[in-house]
C-alpha cells in the first residue's frame, strides 16, 4: 500500500496550542492504517518544493503556506492540514476519499471553498490548474498578494470556470462536520463559553475539527498544562482525541 502522507507547514513562533495539536497529529498517525506526517519548515522546504521563487522569503508565513500546500499536494498527493487542526480520530476515512475519488475539500460556513484542509491525488486537472494559476499570479505580483488570493478566491474561481474539475471530489459542508464553527466565532465557542457548549459543536462525522489562529493566540498566556487541564469547550475535543488513540 502506498504511504499515506499528511503535510503541514510551520515557521516562526511555536505557540503552545500548536505544539499540543501537532503532538496529537503525530500520535494519530499510528491509528487506523496510519500515515506519515511531513512537517515542512524553512530548514527542509527544498526537499519537498521545487522551483522556489526568489520572493518566497519575503512573503508572510500564511502565504508561504499557501504556496507550499498547492505544490506538495499537486506533486505528491495526500492530505494538507493547517497546523491549527485538531485531529480527533483516525484519518482513514479522509484518505479513502483520495483513493476512491480524487480527494476532498471543505466549504467554510457551507459557502466558501476553503484551502486550510484538503486532500487530493497528485496531478489531477484541478491541482495542476490551481498550481499554474498560483505561480502565474505570484510571479506577476512578486509574492505581494491579498490574504486569500491564491487560496479560497482562486479555487472558487476555478470552480466557476471549470467546475468539472471538482466532479470527482467530495465537498463537505463544513458547518455539518469538520468546520462546525465559523472562523469569527471560534474563540467564543471553543474558549469563552462554558464547557458544556461542546454539545453544540459535536457532529456525527468528525475525524478532525478546524480551529483558527485567534484560538491558539488567545491561549498563549497559559502553560501547556493549563491548556490541557482547562475546563473550556475545546478541552472536550482535546480529551476526546486522546481517548481515541
Regions found by a protein language model. Give the residues of each.
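Small-residue hinge/turn detector
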Residues: 67-78
Amino acid at each position: 500500500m502506498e504511504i499515506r502522507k499528511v503535510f503541514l507547514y510551520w515557521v516562526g513562533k511555536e505557540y503552545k496550542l500548536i505544539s499540543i495539536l501537532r503532538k496529537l497529529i503525530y500520535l494519530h498517525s499510528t491509528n487506523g492504517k496510519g500515515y506519515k506526517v511531513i512537517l515542512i519548515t524553512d530548514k527542509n522546504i527544498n526537499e519537498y518544493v521545487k522551483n522556489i521563487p526568489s520572493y518566497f522569503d519575503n512573503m508572510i508565513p500564511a502565504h508561504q503556506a499557501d504556496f507550499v500546500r498547492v505544490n506538495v499536494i499537486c506533486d505528491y498527493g495526500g492530505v494538507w492540514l493547517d497546523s491549527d487542526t485538531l485531529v480527533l480520530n483516525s484519518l482513514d476515512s479522509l484518505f479513502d476519499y483520495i483513493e476512491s475519488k480524487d480527494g476532498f475539500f471543505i466549504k467554510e460556513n457551507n459557502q466558501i471553498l476553503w484551502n486550510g484542509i484538503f486532500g487530493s491525488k497528485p496531478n489531477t486537472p484541478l491541482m495542476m490548474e490551481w498550481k499554474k494559476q498560483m505561480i502565474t499570479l505570484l510571479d506577476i505580483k512578486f509574492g505581494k498578494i491579498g490574504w486569500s488570493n491564491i487560496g479560497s478566491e482562486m479555487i472558487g474561481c476555478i470552480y466557476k470556470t471549470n467546475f468539472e474539475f471538482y466532479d470527482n471530489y467530495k465537498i463537505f459542508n463544513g458547518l455539518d462536520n469538520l468546520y462546525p464553527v465559523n472562523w469569527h466565532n471560534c474563540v467564543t465557542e471553543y474558549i469563552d463559553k462554558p464547557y458544556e457548549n461542546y454539545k453544540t459543536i459535536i457532529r456525527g462525522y468528525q475525524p478532525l475539527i478546524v480551529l483558527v489562529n485567534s484560538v491558539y493566540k488567545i491561549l498563549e498566556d497559559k502553560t501547556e498544562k493549563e491548556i490541557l487541564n482547562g475546563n473550556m469547550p475545546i478541552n472536550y475535543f482535546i480529551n476526546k482525541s486522546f481517548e481515541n488513540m
